Every structure is written in structure tokens, then in C-alpha cells.
Amino acid sequence: MPELTQNPTLKNFQQYVSELETERGFANQTIIDKCLLLGEEVGELFKAVRKSEGLAIDSNSNFTEIGDELTDIFIYLCAIANRKGIDLETAFLKKEEKNKQRIWKSM
């Protein structure tokens, strides 16, 4: 089983997810597969948030912790980036430079 380094970078996480997918037999899933699965995880995050905020929920649904759902989302995000050859660390820094130029107004 692959292992993460101490204090991993985004590159380390992306490599780890790539190795996990190979080990678990998910490496052949398409980007469309991963995007759809990501959407499912976002829905599960919404349910977990509803539960944590005391909103009405389906009592028959299984719920996990918000942190678990965020982790699942992050794994799918890394998998999608890997399929497109996107270095998330570089992409984040580049996008944040664009965001710094934007004017954010309060409503």
C-alpha cells in the first residue's frame, strides 16, 4: 500500500491517489466516471452538513462526518487532475494570482 510522506504537498497527495487507484483497480475509470462520482460525494457532503446543522434529514440515510466527505471529494479532485495532467499546486497558485486582481464586493 502506498504511503504519504510527513507533511505532504499537493503533489504528494496527487501521486498517492494515483498509486491508490492503481492498487485498488480504479486507474481505468474515465474522467467522466470520476466527475460523476465527485458529484455524488458533494451530495453526501451536503447531507452531512444538513445533519450537523440540525436540518431535516432522511432518517433512513447513512451519514458520515463532514471531514470524511471532504476527504472523498479531495481524492476525486486529485484523480480528475491526474487524468488531465494538472498539477494542483501550480494551478492553485496561478488561479489565486488571477483572483487577487478581482474586486470582491459585499452584497
Say what each PLM segment does.
Residues 1-70, 74-107:
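Flexible "arm" and connector segments at domain edges
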